[in-house]
């Protein structure tokens, strides 16, 4: 047998995969585990690709060049058209920094390594995932890397070893072991890298090279295995969510589910197989690749351009739009190339692929050279958009494990260390306030030292990551050696209690078993902060507790820039003060209690200067965005809250005059 028989049920499986992914990405309730659709695609690809290679190998006509040309013909035309369209739409919608980042994504994707880029960008300050139009191409990069490596591995093992199937299975087990280990230690690598994903593709591959004599099942067993396979997939789609450690062992459910369905329907269709082979599912399966390509850019650009949160009707319309674009891509791009109506020869398709890589790669590089073409925007829109960018001077003050001790602190104001009488200690919200601390220190002739680490609450014992615990210990140890009288604690406090404004619970405080409970988190913060304040006071330090600025439910730079491009007013953009007070109720009560119980504790609240008498906590003032994102103040925003920090600087100034910076002066 040299030709791979077409199986309608596999196209039906593709439909299940793409539906799950699309509904998950669009936030449709009930599909919290829809991301496993990618894993379904991996297993199917592994099975089909291995079948193609092995059948041609058995027939004595396998060619690496022909194989790679076939993959290029199948994958690249639709991908390149989508990328070109995304670049065109980005011209009209994206802020310069985001357009530059899109160009970077394009460069990495045409080189088949976008998964490496997005793995590195899976950080605290990177552009939110729903603002990266090509984020979904990471899975294509994984498959493309597999297509390069796997044929070589399969041919090598099958030609050199008698028990090559066992060797291939051993590779699968090693990959699975790496995935399980990486989920616990390096989750971003587990998610994005081929070595930790290869076992899913190899699971399909092992099925393809299994001796056909082992395929036959009784009707009863085939029906049972088929039902079990579908149940495993649905269980993952409906029960998994973003908190599920993934892939690792959790990916066994969709992987084994797909293997079971392909295996059970290999010789005779089961009830589930006939369902998968239905006209609707097969039709969706046929366009699944193109639909997958288009659904994410549609969602991202809609989010980017929308001035309001997308509602159910918006979501429905966008899903249908992505489906239509997917169909058009399949009909007018995929099919002509697959049927060899365009560039039929091997040399032609490889030459066209090379040209596509060069053209798109150079276009992406040009966006880097031109800083995202800022001249596309009006001056006001550009001013708003720039607010999302952090200056390198601020980024350098974000410490991590690699930061040497002599660079743990950033110093502002009076350069003499003995006069640095205040320490600002916190997470990235402390970093965001550098402009106001820098200017205040210079204006008052005092010194300020700042230590901050992203996502690290400045309360010992509450750190959710080991590196945060190490950072806090280093700060505490340095504090005993420094001439510091005042300690200013700054953090995104509500993040650790309730998650971010979008509901991401990645940084919340949890119990000993890793479970989140709001009441327990509040109790942990209260006890931990009380202990920290007591220890600082016992060390002779005055403590300043800085409450967080009102959290916006949208990204002000994006919203304001879009409004400016549409010539619409921006003076009513912000958050209702009632919403701010509601979210901050427990934190406000806790801070007030700490201050009332100890005269050496002062509470600093930015809200009174950010919220007006009309009850609006503004996101913009004087043509400038006060925020870089939903929660970090921009440089303009940081300077705007200078009045609430004036008591701190006056105290530092008075202490410097009394004791030349002595930590115990006027304590």
Explain the meaning of each model-derived region.
Residues 1-343, 359:
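Membrane-interface helix/loop caps of multi-pass membrane proteins
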Residues 242, 306-317, 323-327, 331, ...:
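Extracellular/periplasmic envelope-modification machinery, especially enzymes
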């Amino acid at each position: 047998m040299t030709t791979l028989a077409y199986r309608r049920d596999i196209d039906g499986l593709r439909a299940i995969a793409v539906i799950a992914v699309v509904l998950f990405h669009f936030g449709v309730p009930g599909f919290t585990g829809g991301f496993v659709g990618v894993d379904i695609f991996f297993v199917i690809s592994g099975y089909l690709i291995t079948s193609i290679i092995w059948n041609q190998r058995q027939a004595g006509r396998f060619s690496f060049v022909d194989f790679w040309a076939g993959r290029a013909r199948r994958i690249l035309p639709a991908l390149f058209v989508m990328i070109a369209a995304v670049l065109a739409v980005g011209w009209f919608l994206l802020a310069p920094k985001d357009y530059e980042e899109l160009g970077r994504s394009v460069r990495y994707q045409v080189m088949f390594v976008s998964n490496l880029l997005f793995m590195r960008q899976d950080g605290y300050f990177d552009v939110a995932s729903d603002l990266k139009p090509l984020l979904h191409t990471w899975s294509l990069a994984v498959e493309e890397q597999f297509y390069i490596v796997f044929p070589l591995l399969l041919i090598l093992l099958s030609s050199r070893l008698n028990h090559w199937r066992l060797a291939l299975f051993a590779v699968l087990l090693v990959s699975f072991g790496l995935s399980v280990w990486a989920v616990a230690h390096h989750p971003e690598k587990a998610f994005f890298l081929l070595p930790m994903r290869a076992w899913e593709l190899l699971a399909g591959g092992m099925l393809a090279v299994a001796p056909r004599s082992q395929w036959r099942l009784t009707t009863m067993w085939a029906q049972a295995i088929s039902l079990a396979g579908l149940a495993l997939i649905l269980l993952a789609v409906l029960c998994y969510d973003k908190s599920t450690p993934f892939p690792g062992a959790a990916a066994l459910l969709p992987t084994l589910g797909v293997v079971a369905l392909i295996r059970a329907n290999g010789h005779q269709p089961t009830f589930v197989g006939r369902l998968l082979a239905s006209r609707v599912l097969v039709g969706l399966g046929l366009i699944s690749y193109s639909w997958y390509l288009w659904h994410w850019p549609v969602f991202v650009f809609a989010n980017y351009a929308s001035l309001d949160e997308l509602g159910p009707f918006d979501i429905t319309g966008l899903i249908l739009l992505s489906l239509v674009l997917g169909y058009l891509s399949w009909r007018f791009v995929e099919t002509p190339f697959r049927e060899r109506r365009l560039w039929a020869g091997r040399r032609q398709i490889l030459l066209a692929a090379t040209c596509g890589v060069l053209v798109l790669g150079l276009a992406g590089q040009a966006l880097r050279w031109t800083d995202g073409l800022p001249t596309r925007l009006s001056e006001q829109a550009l001013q708003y958009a720039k607010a999302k960018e952090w200056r390198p001077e601020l980024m350098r003050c974000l410490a991590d494990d690699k930061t040497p001790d002599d660079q743990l602190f950033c110093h502002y104001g009076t350069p003499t260390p003995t006069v640095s009488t205040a320490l600002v200690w916190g997470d990235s919200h402390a970093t965001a306030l550098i402009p106001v601390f820098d200017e205040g220190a210079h204006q008052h002739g005092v010194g300020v030292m700042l230590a901050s680490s992203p996502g690290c609450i400045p309360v010992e014992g509450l750190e959710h990551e080991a590196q945060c615990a190490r950072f806090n210990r280093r700060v505490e140890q340095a504090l005993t050696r420094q001439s510091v009288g005042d300690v200013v604690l700054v953090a995104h406090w509500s993040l650790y209690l309730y998650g971010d404004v979008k509901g991401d619970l990645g940084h919340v405080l949890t119990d000993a078993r890793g479970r989140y409970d709001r009441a327990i988190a509040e109790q942990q913060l209260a006890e931990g902060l009380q202990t920290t304040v007591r220890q600082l006071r016992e060390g002779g330090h005055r403590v300043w507790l800085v409450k967080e600025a009102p959290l916006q439910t949208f990204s002000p730079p994006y919203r304001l820039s879009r409004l400016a491009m549409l010539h619409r007013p921006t003076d009513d953009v912000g958050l209702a003060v009632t919403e701010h007070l509601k979210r901050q109720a427990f934190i406000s009560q806790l801070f007030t209690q700490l201050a009332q119980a100890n005269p050496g504790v002062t509470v600093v609240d930015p809200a009174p200067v950010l919220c007006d008498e009309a009850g609006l906590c503004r996101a913009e003032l004087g043509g400038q965005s006060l925020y870089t994102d939903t929660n970090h103040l921009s440089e303009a925003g940081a300077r705007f809250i200078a009045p609430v920090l004036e008591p701190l600087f006056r105290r530092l100034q008075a202490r410097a005059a009394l004791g030349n910076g002595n930590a115990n002066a006027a304590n």
